[in-house]
């Protein structure tokens, strides 16, 4: 099967040109996540910053709900610390990035949100399982390209026994992306208010 190249974001539009997530499972079981988001801001909806919604619960394959415990390490814009605060909603935690007293000029910006999560993976039989919605589906504009990588402690290469992805609206099982030889997952087409969920299993 042929693999289509990712579309580029038009210069006049607002959106995320690249959503690159680096996840590392630490020896203590905490999942360390760095979300590198490349924004094209055009003073349309991105005027002061943005908000990043994260789930407070995740539904396990057996139907039980697990509480996710977050620690926000920090937020940067172009490598410099950026103001942020948390808003709480039913089932969601929002990281509100930016200063409402400061107008963000039009331009291209690299934001990084660094956080850690407890209870993010599940022990299932003789293997561990991570199911993670990489981008969330609450963005008011398109995400043009998504990348996700997962590293295990003290293990090089691709140690996973299963890797999969699911895209679309909640409950859909489309696979709008591909799995690379090194275990990373990348999207194929832009996303708008859709999930990009990855599955990793390892012994």
Give the role of each language-model region.
Residues 2-203:
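Lumenal/extracellular ectodomains and adaptor appendage modules
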């Amino acid at each position: 099967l042929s693999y289509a190249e990712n579309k580029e974001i038009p210069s006049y539009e607002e959106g995320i040109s690249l959503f690159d997530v680096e996840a590392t499972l630490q020896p203590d079981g905490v999942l360390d996540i760095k979300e590198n988001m490349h924004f094209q801001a055009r003073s349309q909806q991105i005027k002061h910053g943005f908000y990043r919604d994260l789930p407070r619960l995740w539904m396990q394959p057996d139907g039980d709900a697990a509480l996710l415990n977050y620690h926000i390490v920090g937020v940067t814009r172009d490598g410099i610390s950026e103001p942020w605060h948390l808003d709480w909603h039913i089932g969601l935690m929002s990281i509100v990035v930016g200063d409402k007293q400061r107008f963000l000029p039009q331009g291209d910006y690299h934001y990084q949100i660094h956080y850690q999560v407890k209870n993010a993976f599940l022990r299932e039989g003789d293997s561990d399982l991570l199911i993670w919605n990489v981008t969330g589906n609450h963005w008011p504009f398109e995400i043009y390209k998504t990348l996700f990588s997962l590293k295990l402690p003290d293990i090089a290469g691709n140690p996973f026994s299963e890797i999969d992805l699911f895209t679309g609206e909640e409950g859909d099982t489309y696979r709008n992306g591909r799995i690379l030889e090194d275990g990373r997952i990348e999207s194929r087409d832009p996303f708008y208010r859709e999930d990009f969920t990855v599955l990793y299993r390892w012994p």
